[in-house]
């Protein structure tokens, strides 16, 4: 899965990944007002993905949500398209070089850190892969190309396949945003639904044909080359990303009052709660993974992209501050927690009774440290070095 994203991959004032977060100060000249509630949402999404990978005990009432939290990877891609378009779509000129360097500066330093921390995992990869697969993964993964090979998408850092998709989406964004888009809200809404439906066609065909010849309905533990292609290949997420861009344009075209946004936020959240409480376990996994809930997520984004009590709750400063670390949390949590458990760190420290919560806290602390001591300084250094010399 991933989030990223991916703005600050996971910065609403810049972009979103799965998995960066928005700033909350006054907008710079030429920039739109920040949307801190969307950063708060990222906090909730990222924590659910952590729980999906490492499910906490004694939270059975939340298991229907936690066990389906893979759906939030699509939410991150939706946010990525929305926030990028929100910030860049109406600029008269989009300097592609500056845009791509800015995206690289956000993603790659922490990505390299995640690979360095995960170096021990290469030993495990060596034992379960053929030599050809191992050395191919060793080339594809540092170059963010692993997502194009369904059998190696999770090589080295299981969750980092999402960055392969982000690279493709970022490469395409300057061209997508300059397409002649509809102007009216009704046509934009129709386009949004159409693009979403097109994105679900491959997943629907998979359900009808079952090309992997699975013995039963697919679930999170199922595997097969076609299913892995749908789950990990960058192409599978283009439509969700384009829905995000369309949603940003719809957001601009609509005239929505604060009360209407509140209704959208409460209504979409109520439907989502009802869905996870009642029918999520009876809904085909392949469709959920492919973005079945994207329209509901889109309504929620519209509801939170303005002033109302629900948006204010998600914009609470502690939640926003955590939201600014979600890219690092997403990228680092999987192998960090696995390594902590591999070496029985809580038990050796006499803190086994506090596990898994102390392990979650350690992963979060690492994400905070990486955000402030690696991601931001490295990004500033890259942008400074890439700036034209006067």
Where are these regions (language model features)?
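Membrane-cytosol interface segments of multi-pass membrane proteins
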Residues: 1-218, 320, 325-326, 346-390
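Conserved protein kinase catalytic core
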Residues: 59, 255, 339
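Membrane-interface micro-motifs in multi-pass membrane enzymes
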Residues: 70, 158-166, 230-245, 290-294
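Structural signal for the C-terminal ends of transmembrane alpha-helices
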Residues: 85-91, 122-123, 175-182, 245-255, ...
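Hydrophobic alpha-helical segments of polytopic membrane proteins
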Residues: 179-196, 253-273
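Loop-centered beta-sheet repeat module
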Residues: 196-204, 223-224, 236, 245
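Membrane-interface segments at the starts/ends of alpha-helical transmembrane spans
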Residues: 219-229, 351
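Alpha-helical transmembrane segments of multi-pass integral membrane proteins
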Residues: 233-234, 241, 265-376
